[in-house]
C-alpha cells in the first residue's frame, strides 16, 4: 500500500546528506617476529555516529521553502532524509593457551528519524540474523521485537528496526593446521522506536525487551590465516521471540 510509510520509503527516491564520525581502538599487538609471545587478553572497541539532513533543513527554514504534498521539504525535487544514528561494539578475547580461547562480543545501536523524516531510510536501519548477528536466523529474518512476518516475499522490508542489541560468547579450539573448531551462543534482536501498524510487536519497551531477545547456539569451523579468518557456522534457534511461534 502506498499509504504504508515503511513500504513507500523503502522504494522511493530520497536524498541523504550526512556527516559521520567513526572510532576504532584495540590493544591487540601487531604480529611481528618480535612479538611472538602469546597475548593473553585483548579487546577491540568500534563506535560510529552520523547525522543527516540538518544543514538542508536549516536552509529550507531560512529561505522559507514550502512543503510539498507529503508534508516534507525537498531538494532537486527529491525528499531528503533527516536522522541521527549511533552504534558501538565491544569485543574481548581471552587466550587460555596457544590452542584455546574464549571470545565475547556485545553491540548496540539506535537510529532516530526527526524533522523532515518519519522513518529512517531503509538502508540505514538495523537488521538481525546472519553471520554477524544471531546465527540461528538468516539475514533479515529476525524481529523487530516479537513481530512475525506473514509475507515471505516482502518480509525483508518489515524486518528492520531502529534499535539493535546483540551479544555472543564463543569458545575456540585449534584442531590442526589452520583449522579451528568453535562452539557459540548468540543473543539479540532489533526493535522500532515507534509503534508502526505494519510491524506489530516491534516497538521497544523496557518491560518487555528482555523477553524478546532471540537466543541461538551452534558450532562452526574456522580457517585462521592470522591476517584474515574464514568462517563456517551452523546455528540453531533456542528461543524464538516471534508471536504465534513456540518460543523454546
PLM ranges: what are they?
Residues 12:
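Acidic, glycine-rich catalytic/binding loops that coordinate metals and/or anionic ligands
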Residues 26-28:
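Intrinsically disordered, low-complexity linker/loop segments enriched in Gly/Pro
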Residues 1, 8, 16-18, 38-248:
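C-terminal transmembrane beta-barrel domains of outer membrane proteins
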Amino acid at each position: 500500500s502506498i499509504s504504508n510509510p515503511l513500504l513507500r520509503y523503502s522504494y522511493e527516491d530520497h536524498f541523504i546528506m550526512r556527516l559521520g564520525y567513526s572510532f576504532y581502538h584495540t590493544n591487540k599487538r601487531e604480529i611481528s617476529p618480535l612479538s611472538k609471545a602469546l597475548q593473553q587478553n585483548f579487546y577491540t572497541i568500534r563506535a560510529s555516529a552520523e547525522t543527516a539532513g540538518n544543514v538542508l533543513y536549516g536552509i529550507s527554514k531560512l529561505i522559507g521553502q514550502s512543503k510539498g504534498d507529503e508534508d516534507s521539504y525537498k531538494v532537486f525535487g527529491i525528499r531528503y532524509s533527516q536522522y541521527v544514528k549511533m552504534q558501538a561494539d565491544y569485543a574481548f578475547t581471552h587466550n587460555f593457551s596457544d590452542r584455546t580461547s574464549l571470545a565475547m562480543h556485545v553491540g548496540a545501536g539506535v537510529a532516530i528519524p526527526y524533522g523532515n523524516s518519519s522513518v529512517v531510510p531503509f538502508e540505514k536501519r538495523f537488521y538481525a540474523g546472519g553471520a554477524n548477528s544471531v546465527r540461528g536466523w538468516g539475514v533479515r529474518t529476525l524481529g523487530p521485537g516479537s513481530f512475525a512476518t506473514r509475507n515471505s516475499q516482502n518480509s525483508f522490508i518489515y524486518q528492520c528496526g531502529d534499535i539493535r542489541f546483540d551479544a555472543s560468547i564463543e569458545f575456540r579450539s585449534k584442531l590442526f593446521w589452520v583449522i579451528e573448531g568453535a562452539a557459540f551462543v548468540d543473543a539479540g534482536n532489533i526493535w522500532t522506536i515507534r509503534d508502526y501498524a505494519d510491524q506489530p510487536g516491534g516497538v521497544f519497551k523496557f518491560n518487555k525487551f528482555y523477553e524478546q531477545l532471540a537466543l541461538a547456539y551452534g558450532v562452526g569451523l574456522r580457517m585462521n590465516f592470522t591476517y584474515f579468518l574464514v568462517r563456517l557456522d551452523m546455528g540453531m534457534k533456542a528461543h524464538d521471540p516471534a508471536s504465534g511461534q513456540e518460543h523454546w
